[in-house]
């Protein structure tokens, strides 16, 4: 599994950290793309970089599987900015988790980058799992349902799938997201 970060949301933040822990406990080999991204990143350049990372990771995982005689288990877990690499992963036929996908453009991205919905050329690729909060300004439930039937929306949750001033609900959501990824 390849774990990919978002802007200000590194792989050691709760959603990605616990996804990695749960998947490792479930027998997955976990690779993490450890980037420190800020709002001044050039979205098209970063998306292209992430697509190259996916290509390299996929090639290495397939090579390892062939050498070991094991079946390749390929899954990409993305968060926020890295969800914009989904169209590329879908074309490769990869299973993908989209945590807080960018379906509405962030105001700081002059390129207005979003995941197109519906996604052209995704026929035949596995439907992604989408998890997001309904208080996330970059999430759009209708667009999400154009991409997949596997949409988990969390009431009152923000772009981190957390509910401000409600740690109990935030932890419950974290558990639900982690479980959905493992399932």
Kindly label every feature range from the protein language model:
Residues 1-71, 163:
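Serine-hydrolase catalytic machinery in alpha/beta-hydrolase-like enzymes
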Residues 7, 35, 97-106, 133-135:
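Active-site nucleophile loop of the alpha/beta-hydrolase fold
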Residues 54-127:
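Primarily recognizes the serine-hydrolase "nucleophile elbow" in alpha/beta-hydrolase
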Residues 107, 137-143:
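Conserved alpha/beta-hydrolase "acid-adjacent" motif
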Residues 124, 130-132, 136:
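Short beta-strand/loop motif that positions the catalytic acidic residue
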Residues 134-139, 159-160:
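Acidic catalytic loop of the alpha/beta-hydrolase fold
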Residues 157-173:
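Catalytic histidine-centered segment of alpha/beta-hydrolase-like enzymes
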